[in-house]
Amino acid sequence: MKNVNDSFVSLGHWPFAGSFGFNTDILATNPINLSVVLGVLIFFGKGVLNDLLDNRKQRILSTIRNSEELRGGAIEQLEKAWARLRKVEMEADEFRVNGYSEIEREKMNLIIATNENLERLENYKNETIHFEQQRAINQVRQRVFQQALQGALGTLKSCLNSELHLRTISDNIGTLGDMNMKEITD
């Protein structure tokens, strides 16, 4: 009981406030003031807190949606990049195959052209050899003919004397005369 009296006595020691107000000193407040403050905070703070949480939730959802859209766009770009890469690889393989076949075709064309050139050169060589052989044969024939002619002329000059010469001429004139007579009579 003494405690109860002391609490009333202690009320007498406190100075009275000149007006109604809130005591901001938490240690000096009583449970009624605390419950009023908590009630006001809960009543008004609930809406603010709900608004803050809703805004935060909307920002998080918006960020997630944006992230999903960016992820979807990135996946789409990645798929396009893979498709382009496959296409470029196929084109590179095609160019490589076509390049190799083109190289083989050019190689075969070059071999064929080289063989044709070799054949032409071989034919030209053979023609040149044949021509040189014919020329050499003709030169030998001319020399043999000239030597034979000179030998025959030398033999004729050594064998012919003026009497033989006159007799051959008269025989030839006689033969020509006989031929002329036959032609006239015929």
Curated annotation (Swiss-Prot):
Main location: plastid
Keyword Isomerase attached: no
Signal sequence range: none
Subcellular location: Plastid, Chloroplast thylakoid membrane
GO cellular component: chloroplast thylakoid membrane; proton-transporting ATP synthase complex
Keyword Transport carried by entry: yes
Domain of life: Eukaryota
Membrane spanning residue stretches: 27-49
UniProt GO MF annotations: proton-transporting ATP synthase activity, rotational mechanism
Membrane topology listed for this record: Single-pass membrane protein
Alphabetical keyword list: ATP synthesis, CF(0), Chloroplast, Hydrogen ion transport, Ion transport, Membrane, Plastid, Thylakoid, Transmembrane, Transmembrane helix, Transport
PANTHER family in the cross-refs: ATP SYNTHASE SUBUNIT B, CHLOROPLASTIC (PTHR34264:SF3)
Family as reported in the entry's similarity comment: Belongs to the ATPase B chain family.
Oligomer and partners: F-type ATPases have 2 components, F(1) - the catalytic core - and F(0) - the membrane proton channel. F(1) has five subunits: alpha(3), beta(3), gamma(1), delta(1), epsilon(1). F(0) has four main subunits: a(1), b(1), b'(1) and c(10-14). The alpha and beta chains form an alternating ring which encloses part of the gamma chain. F(1) is attached to F(0) by a central stalk formed by the gamma and epsilon chains, while a peripheral stalk is formed by the delta, b and b' chains.
Xref: HAMAP family: ATP_synth_b_bprime
Misc: In plastids the F-type ATPase is also known as CF(1)CF(0).
Role this protein plays: F(1)F(0) ATP synthase produces ATP from ADP in the presence of a proton or sodium gradient. F-type ATPases consist of two structural domains, F(1) containing the extramembraneous catalytic core and F(0) containing the membrane proton channel, linked together by a central stalk and a peripheral stalk. During catalysis, ATP synthesis in the catalytic domain of F(1) is coupled via a rotary mechanism of the central stalk subunits to proton translocation. Component of the F(0) channel, it forms part of the peripheral stalk, linking F(1) to F(0).
Protein name (database record): ATP synthase subunit b, chloroplastic
